[in-house]
Regions:
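RNase H-like, metal-dependent nuclease domains and their acidic two-metal-ion catalytic environment used
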Residues: 1-92, 131-177
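Short alpha-helix plus adjacent loop in nuclease-associated cores
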Residues: 89-134
Length: 177
């Protein structure tokens, strides 16, 4: 399995609202275990970003899943590194590397402002919904998506205004991972 995180770096925002941090963990295909399904949804904004980072770290360690982060918000990466768990942070997946991607990039995660990544993210969710949510009309199989908040987030998702859609961002990152 693997995970995706939509993180934040500031403890509090000016207006006190701010977006939540979000984490999804996903079981990839496996012959013996439930696969192609999300197994964890977490969305919260604790008073300190460090608390969110630690919650994500504990989830990654408990499940043994590496996670994909947005590399423009690096507080979570610093937290994992300071605790000695940077091995749980994924590098940019090969299928998301473009010709412009440097070969030896040391930064973990992927850029959330890259148009290639934004498009791949939207396509990953679209494909997942088509193949694993509801009834697959071609096979007759019933998909398993147990997290209603994520489903609602997907319904309202606006690719041109992604700020409010924390669950969509983290779920998409998990699928890209």
């Amino acid at each position: 399995g693997c995970g995706g995180v939509d993180s934040y770096d500031l403890d509090m925002t000016v207006d006190g609202r701010g977006s939540k941090g979000a984490l999804h963990l996903y079981n990839k295909f496996h012959m013996e275990h439930p696969s192609n399904m999300f197994v964890l949804e977490y969305a919260s904004r604790p008073p300190l970003a460090k608390i969110f980072y630690e919650d994500v770290l504990m989830s990654a360690v408990f499940y043994g899943y590496p996670i994909l982060i947005e590399n423009n918000k690096y507080g979570i990466a610093r937290h994992f590194e300071s605790r000695g768990y940077d091995g749980y942070l994924m590098a940019r997946p090969d299928h998301l590397k473009s010709a412009n991607t440097k070969i030896n990039v040391k930064t973990k995660g992927i850029p959330s402002n890259s148009q290639d990544v934004i498009q791949a993210h939207a396509h990953a969710i679209e494909a997942y919904v088509h193949n694993h949510v509801g009834i697959n009309r071609e096979t007759g199989e019933v998909g398993r998506m147990y997290f209603n908040k994520t489903l609602e987030d997907w319904i309202g998702f606006d690719i041109n205004n992604r700020t409010k859609f924390d669950l969509t961002i983290s779920a998409g990152l998990a699928l890209l991972a």
